[in-house]
Regions:
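N-terminal glycine-rich flavin-associated loop
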Residues: 67-88
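Short, solvent-exposed loop/turn elements at beta->coil junctions and helix N-caps
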Residues: 44, 109-113, 138-139
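A short, Trp-centered hydrophobic/proline-enriched beta-strand micro-motif
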Residues: 100-109
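Active-site-adjacent elements of ketosynthase-type condensing enzymes
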Residues: 112-120
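A structural signal for short hydrophobic beta-strand segments in well-ordered beta-sheet cores
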Residues: 122-125
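Buried hydrophobic positions in well-ordered alpha/beta secondary-structure cores of metabolic enzymes
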Residues: 3, 35, 42, 58, ...
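A short core secondary-structure module
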Residues: 130, 134-173
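Amphipathic, small/basic residue-rich leader segments at the start of a protein or domain
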Residues: 1-72, 92, 96
Length: 173
């Protein structure tokens, strides 16, 4: 009901014409007022313990209004990667996704890759306790709004090889 009342086509067009290309208040409302961003996460992180079904329901509702909210990038892809990885980074970032304070942009596509997920030329070289990433990404949806970038980079293997690709969560500031 919230989306139907908030996201009529004319309002969507106005949001897209704003300098930031969206209304940040809607994302905050989805997370804080309605609590929807907590649905697919474990109770230990402040979630409701849902999963794929809850994500599918939400994606369907967002699709009905052609929403421009970063649900897929932040909750499904970013949150899913964090859930799978676990650990301190997940413990710190998932609650920020749930509260609406974190928006994740998934930086995976590269100009030469033509959406082949294994065609990654971006490299990650260990440097002390961290990594230095070097390369180019293209079409990173939600990047202008993101607090974090989830970047694919190669730590080993050749450019089109499936092995040797890792994901790095990087603060966007």
């Amino acid at each position: 009901r919230f989306l139907a009342d908030t996201y009529d086509f004319e309002t969507r067009k106005k949001m897209l014409s704003r300098p930031e290309g969206r209304d940040p208040g809607i994302w905050k409302a989805l997370s804080t007022e309605l609590g929807l961003t907590c649905a697919p996460f474990a109770e230990a992180h402040g979630g409701m313990g849902g999963g794929a079904i809850e994500n599918m329901i939400m994606m369907e509702e967002l699709g009905k209004v052609i929403a421009i909210e970063p649900w897929l990038q932040t909750v499904v892809i970013g949150g899913g990667a964090l859930k799978a990885a676990g650990g301190a980074l997940a413990d710190a970032t998932i609650p920020a996704i749930i509260s609406g304070d974190a928006i994740i942009a998934f930086a995976y596509a590269e100009p030469q890759g033509r959406y082949n997920l294994a065609d990654i030329g971006t490299t990650a070289k260990q440097d002390g306790a961290g990594y230095v990433l070097n390369g180019h990404k293209a079409v990173v949806y939600a990047a202008p709004w993101a607090t974090h970038l989830l970047v694919t980079a190669r730590t080993g293997g050749s450019r089109r090889e499936r092995a040797g690709v890792e994901m790095f969560l990087i603060a966007a500031n």
